[in-house]
Structures are given as structure tokens and as C-alpha cells.
């Protein structure tokens, strides 16, 4: 959320939106390969980082990736992303930011059953529509 806040005035945003975004750090997101409701369209953290600097367990400072998506060699960023801090401590991250969409629309749709809601999600995806986000909310609280 801080990344999006820092670039929104220039018309950009950072796509991953983990549910912990109000309290998490980008290093923690890399360590956990965090995702969120936008993961279907934009991927998780591993799909939205270009490079990292990290301190390895022996104290060595290591830089992986760069400023472009296409890097030669093995995908070491993919190895680090989701490693839960076991391979080192992330100290710097280069992220991919996206241009804000021209329009944003939201819809809230009710369904008689969870199965009907799930079928709607399946129908949307199977027809080639990839929304920026979809969530199913259960009515567990009745007033």
C-alpha cells in the first residue's frame, strides 16, 4: 500500500495487494511471496519484482535481478521469493509498477448459494474475462 501511495500521484500503482498490506513490509511480501485479490490477473509478488538486494546467512551482500523483467540465467529471484527468509534477509527490492487503469468498476452480486457464486466465477473466467479482482463473501453473520 505504501508503494502505491508513493506513485499514485504519477498515475501508477503496485498490483499485489495482500490482506496484511496495512502492516506488512515489502521484504516480508517477498519472503512470503504474498498475493491478494489481484493475483489472478497480475500474479503474486514473484511476478511483480524485478530485483532484490539481500544479506546472505554468511553476511555476504547479494544482488539478484535488475531493472528489467528479462534477465539471463537461472531465476534466482523465484528461488528467493517465498523462501520465508531462510536464504537471507531482504534489504532492498526493485518492483514493477503499472499504469492506473483508465476506468475502474465495482459490482456486488448476491447468489442464493455458494455453489451459484462459484459457478459465476467459473463462467467469467472460462469466457476469457480476467477481472482485476474477485472475492466471495459468505453471509456468516445474520442480524
Which residues fall in each region the model found?
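Conserved small/polar residues in nucleotide/adenosyl-binding loops
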Residues: 141-143
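Acidic, glycine-rich loop-and-beta core segments that form the ion-binding/anion-interacting portion
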Residues: 138
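FAD-binding subdomain of flavoenzyme oxidoreductases
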Residues: 1-135
Amino acid at each position: 500500500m505504501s508503494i502505491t501511495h508513493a506513485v499514485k500521484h504519477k498515475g501508477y500503482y503496485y498490483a499485489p495487494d495482500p490482506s496484511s498490506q496495512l502492516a506488512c513490509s515489502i521484504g516480508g511480501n517477498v519472503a512470503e511471496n504474498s498475493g491478494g485479490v489481484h493475483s489472478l490477473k497480475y500474479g503474486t509478488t514473484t511476478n511483480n519484482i524485478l530485483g532484490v538486494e539481500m544479506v546472505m546467512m554468511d553476511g555476504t551482500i547479494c544482488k539478484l535481478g535488475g531493472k528489467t523483467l528479462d534477465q539471463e540465467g537461472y531465476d534466482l529471484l523465484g528461488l528467493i521469493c517465498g523462501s520465508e527468509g531462510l536464504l537471507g534477509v531482504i534489504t532492498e527490492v526493485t518492483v514493477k509498477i503499472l499504469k492506473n487503469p483508465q476506468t475502474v468498476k465495482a459490482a456486488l452480486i448476491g447468489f442464493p448459494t455458494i455453489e451459484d457464486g462459484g459457478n459465476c466465477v467459473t463462467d467469467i473466467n472460462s469466457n476469457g474475462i480476467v477481472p482485476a479482482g474477485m472475492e466471495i463473501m459468505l453471509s456468516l453473520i445474520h442480524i
